Regions:
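Structured helix-beta-strand junction loops
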Residues: 35-37, 73-74, 112
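Acidic active-site catalytic centers that drive phospho-/nucleotidyl reactions
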Residues: 9, 102, 120
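Acidic, PIN/NYN-like endoribonuclease modules and their adjacent C-terminal/linker elements
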Residues: 1-5, 79, 106-135
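Active-site neighborhoods of divalent-metal-dependent phosphate/nucleic-acid chemistry enzymes
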Residues: 77-115
Length: 135
């Protein structure tokens, strides 16, 4: 049986490093990945968003560098951001009135034919987007 791929946005991945609502569910997704049960896909943008979010939570430089290293060591599949993906993101952004940043995640999920899991309420209006709190 082929492993299911899932796109995670930064609102989910940041919960691996910061105790928040539904952090347990986010960590369960990471554990499923580490156990080889699922494939995780993120754009490189995710790492930037996570480090930025954690920076504003008053974390130290040392901690932020450790998070960056931990993310690298996980070897999560990084979706290439190319013109095809950006064109799809623009289309989604205009259709649903989203930022291009958020639309990138939706576009990746659509192009890979898999679920996007998010804790971002703004994305719940998109068909086939999964609320982290409901998994």
């Amino acid at each position: 049986m082929e492993k299911q791929a899932k796109v995670l946005d930064a609102s989910v991945v940041v919960k691996w490093f910061s105790e928040e609502e539904n952090s347990d569910k986010a960590i369960n997704l990471k554990e499923s990945y580490l156990n080889g049960e699922i494939i995780l896909i993120i754009p490189i943008l995710t790492k930037i968003e996570i480090l930025n979010a954690l920076r504003y939570k008053k974390n130290s430089e040392e901690y932020l560098k450790k998070v960056n290293e931990d993310l690298e060591n996980l070897q999560i599949k990084i979706a290439e951001i190319n013109n095809n993906l950006l064109d799809k993101a623009v289309e989604i952004s205009l259709k649903y009135n989203l930022t291009i940043y958020d639309s990138i995640y939706v576009a990746i999920a659509q192009l890979y034919g898999c679920q996007l899991i998010t804790a971002d309420k703004e994305l719940f209006k998109i068909p086939d987007v999964v609320d982290l709190g409901k998994i």
